[in-house]
Amino acid sequence: MGSEMCIRDRDVGIRDRSMLELLYACGLRVSELVGIQLTEVILSDGVIRVTGKGSKTRLVPMGEEAVDWIKKYLVKSRQNILNKQTSKFLFVTNRGGEMTRQAFWYLIKKYALMANIDKPMSPHILRHAFATHLINHGADLRVVQMLLGHSDISTTQIYTHVARERLKKLHQEHHPRG
């Protein structure tokens, strides 16, 4: 029984890391993450088809790291977690059921605690970091809008405030007249 638990713990850990990597790499909403179906993962192209608000779909690139973790999860861990059950969803709970938003929130809190992160942590913080990092590294606002699935550009413009603050700080630190 002990070795079975170790394998199960490892498989659940791989699932959790895959979820975290995908959430950050794609800037997904939690509902989008837990709702991903196997047929929406296109590993050969490194993209996922995401169904967002208003049932609008978009293709989002996953990035190499997320693809690698998803592959690890799909090769063996997912089947071990399912334990002879089936599911159309990419991510499943420890009992083989559909992952819920609440269950994922619990995971985020658990890992933040384990990492001694004493600031409030939520899945939306990773979505916010995704958008902020893209904008800070020069991504076009319209591209970020598409990746986030925002229907209105003004929703995406919130993230430019963070970029402006960063630019102001960098100017003050590095310019002789800053």
Which residues does each PLM region occupy?
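Conserved catalytic core of the tyrosine transesterase superfamily
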Residues: 3-4, 8-178
